[in-house]
Amino acid sequence: ACVPVYEECGTPKKRCCEERPCK
C-alpha cells in the first residue's frame, strides 16, 4: 500500500510511494 511521506522536510507537501522518506 502507498504511504504518504513528506516530499520536503518541514513542509506540508506530501507524496505517495516516495522511494526514500525524508529523515
UniProtKB/Swiss-Prot annotation:
| Major place of residence | secreted
> Superkingdom, according to UniProt?
Eukaryota
Any Pfam family the entry gives: Toxin_9
Q: Which UniProt keywords apply?
A: Calcium channel impairing toxin, Disulfide bond, Ion channel impairing toxin, Knottin, Neurotoxin, Secreted, Toxin, Voltage-gated calcium channel impairing toxin
The question of whether Disulfide bond is a record keyword is answered with yes
Supply the SUPFAM superfamilies for this chain: omega toxin-like
* A GO molecular function held by the record: calcium channel regulator activity
> In which tissues or organs does this protein occur?
Expressed by the venom gland.
The entry's cellular-component GO terms read:
extracellular region
Disulphide bond pairs:
C2-C17, C9-C22
Task: Provide the protein's localization.
Answer: Secreted
What is the annotated role of this protein in its UniProt record?
Antagonist of L-type calcium channels (Cav1/CACNA1).
Domain remarks: The presence of a 'disulfide through disulfide knot' structurally defines this protein as a knottin.
Similarity-based family: Belongs to the neurotoxin 02 (plectoxin) family. 01 (Tx3) subfamily.
Protein name (database record)? U3-ctenitoxin-Co1a
Species name for this entry?
A: Ctenus ornatus (Brazilian spider)
